[in-house]
């Protein structure tokens, strides 16, 4: 779990940017989006094979 403490004399915007950066590094937001709706195993396999095909070319 990402945790960001606001430093002394740091603006909220800067702290929020640091927090969002840490979330993206961990992959938390991507994981939440992926788990938001159920995905059938056949669809997962299809996406996985398409991603492999894209990497190949």
Swiss-Prot record:
InterPro entries: Ribosomal_bS21, Ribosomal_bS21_CS, Ribosomal_bS21_sf. Signal peptide: none annotated. One of its GO terms (molecular function) is structural constituent of ribosome. Residues 32-57 are annotated as: Disordered. It comes from the Bacteria. Residues 33-57 have a biased composition (Basic residues). Keywords: Ribonucleoprotein, Ribosomal protein. Disulfide bonds: none annotated. Transmembrane segments: none annotated. GO terms for cellular component: ribonucleoprotein complex; ribosome. Belongs to the bacterial ribosomal protein bS21 family. This is Small ribosomal subunit protein bS21. It comes from Shouchella clausii (strain KSM-K16).
